């Protein structure tokens, strides 16, 4: 049984990069959340800030896990704790350079095809403030 990473209640697996966004079914893409913290008002399915925050956390972990600029498929298999079939899916979308697969491309692919910036959170907050001013 899984426990919510926030409150400790019974939890389900949340895919940080959702499957429909191109997310992989790997441990690094999991966050264990109870129903409230998963699908509630402040959960990643209903709160864009929470969703982006979790994606930024995952992306930061990936950059820490992959400090080199290039990796072989064998290295990725071990570091990402990924199945052979998911590894094949990952590398088929990547260009193989003479040095190996590019860290930036690997991470972007695992993040659903893009890299996230902390500026996104600021833009969302500014947009929300602007919207509230225009309504009020």
Stretches with model-predicted labels:
Residues 1-12, 34-36:
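Short cysteine-rich loop/turn motifs with clustered Cys
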Residues 17-30:
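Short linker/helix segments within small regulatory modules
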Residues 30-53:
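Short Cys/His-centered divalent metal-binding micro-motifs
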Residues 91-134:
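Short helix-start
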């Amino acid at each position: 049984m899984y426990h919510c990473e926030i409150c400790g209640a019974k939890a389900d697996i949340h895919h940080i990069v959702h499957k429909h966004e191109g997310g992989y079914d790997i441990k690094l893409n999991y966050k264990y959340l109870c129903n409230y913290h998963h699908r509630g008002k402040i959960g990643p399915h209903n709160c864009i800030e929470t969703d982006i925050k979790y994606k930024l956390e995952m992306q930061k972990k990936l950059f820490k896990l992959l400090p080199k600029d290039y990796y072989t498929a064998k290295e990725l298999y071990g570091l990402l704790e990924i199945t052979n079939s998911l590894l094949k899916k990952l590398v088929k979308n990547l260009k193989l350079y003479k040095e190996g697969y590019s860290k930036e491309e690997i991470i972007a692919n695992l993040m659903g095809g893009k890299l996230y910036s902390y500026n996104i959170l600021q833009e969302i907050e500014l947009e929300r403030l602007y919207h509230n001013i225009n309504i009020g």
